[in-house]
């Protein structure tokens, strides 16, 4: 999943807040957005590994 890719997360979040401008609150929103995308990604990949590695 490319959510895991920091470049993807960055452009996704910058696009989401493109009308926000250069205010410091906008930067904070973008950073928060990137963090949450990456957390979602990490959870998804750990879920996958826990199901696939389960012993028979």
Curated annotation (Swiss-Prot):
It comes from the Eukaryota. Keywords: Disulfide bond, Pheromone, Secreted. It comes from Aplysia vaccaria (California black sea hare). Disulfide bonds join 4-41, 13-33, 20-26. One of its GO terms (cellular component) is extracellular region. SUPFAM superfamilies: Mollusk pheromone. Pfam families: Attractin. The keyword Chaperone does not apply. Its main location: secreted. GO terms for molecular function: mating pheromone activity. Water-borne pheromone that attract the marine mollusk Aplysia into breeding aggregations and coordinate male and female reproductive behavior within the aggregation. This is Attractin. GO terms for biological process: sexual reproduction. Produced by the albumen gland of the egg cordons. It is found in: Secreted.
């Amino acid at each position: 999943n490319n959510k895991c890719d920091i470049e993807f997360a960055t452009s996704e979040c910058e696009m989401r807040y493109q009308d926000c401008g250069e205010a410091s609150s906008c930067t904070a929103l973008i950073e928060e957005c990137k963090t949450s995308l990456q957390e979602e990604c990490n959870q998804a990949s750990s879920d996958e590994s826990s199901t696939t590695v389960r012993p028979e």
